[in-house]
Design a protein with these regions (language model features):
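Short beta-strand-loop/turn "lid" adjacent to the catalytic site in phosphate-handling enzymes
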Residues: 44-100
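Glycine-rich nucleotide/cofactor/substrate-binding loop typically near the N-terminus or early
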Residues: 6-60, 64, 68
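Conserved ATP-utilizing enzyme core subdomain
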Residues: 2-17, 22-23, 165-240
Length: 240
């Protein structure tokens, strides 16, 4: 939905978020990205969108640096996640759109990227940052707190003593946003206004909860490769 830019100062065990900006993606670019995700990915389309999104990100990073009267020397490195196209830790692969080399050339700043694939190569599920950050917070406040993060997909972090467990629990806003866009001409359910007018379909919920992923033991992660419109429509047919 947007390009999020956080400018933070990190010294030893101290993390201070100084500035944060959110730049909305225009509808045309979002549609192109979704087409690449869901349809056959021709190399030409992928290259064009890859370049377009990278140059757009570079532009917004430059805007934020200028906005807060910083210099490029103030930025030691840019952490870049890109936009996930395909996430299959079961196949030991995770691909994203966005070119870290081009981004580094445009900004003339060191760019650190490929967090997901590097984590998978190290035996993880390809989502290392949330768990590390939550573990950091627990050490600072000296309490064991469980974190549930509801983004496109939901992930949970549980810390106990020196052990931290983090994994995806299942879908969250992704399916809701998809439904709002297709059937209500809305980007998302603002303030839960649509949901508040309805009632829980217990039979549909029971059908969805039979999904094998929910019974799978951690470590595990998921994405739109499993939880997508076809998945929802399949369960609707079962209970109709």
């Amino acid at each position: 939905d947007s390009i999020d830019i956080s400018i933070a100062s990190i010294t030893g065990k101290r993390i201070l978020v100084k500035f944060f900006d959110e730049y909305k993606l225009d509808a045309a670019l979002k549609n192109k990205i979704n087409e690449i995700k869901t349809n056959s990915r021709s190399s030409n389309n992928l290259k064009k969108v890859n370049s377009s999104i990278t140059l757009l990100i570079a532009k917004h990073v430059q805007q934020s640096i200028s906005k807060y009267k910083l210099t490029y020397k103030d930025i030691h490195a840019v952490g870049f996640t890109g936009i996930t196209l395909n996430h299959r830790p079961d196949l030991k692969t995770s691909t994203f759109i966005g070119d870290p080399i081009l981004l580094s050339k445009k900004l003339k700043i060191t760019v650190v990227s490929d967090f997901r694939q590097t984590d998978i190569d190290a035996g993880g599920q390809g989502a290392p940052l949330a768990g590390l950050f939550h573990n950091y917070l627990n050490r600072i406040i000296k309490k064991n707190i469980t974190y549930l993060n509801l983004g496109g997909f939901a992930n949970i972090t549980v810390s106990h003593q020196d052990r931290t467990i983090s994994y995806d629990t299942g879908p969250a806003n992704y399916l809701i946003d998809l439904w709002c866009d297709k059937y209500f001409d809305m980007e998302y359910d603002i303030d839960g206004s649509l949901a508040s007018m309805g009632n829980i379909n217990i039979e549909l919920l029971k059908s969805m909860l039979k999904e094998k992923y929910f019974k799978k033991k951690y470590p595990k992660s998921t994405g739109f490769e499993l939880f997508n419109e076809s998945w929802v429509q399949g369960h609707l047919k079962k209970v109709s």
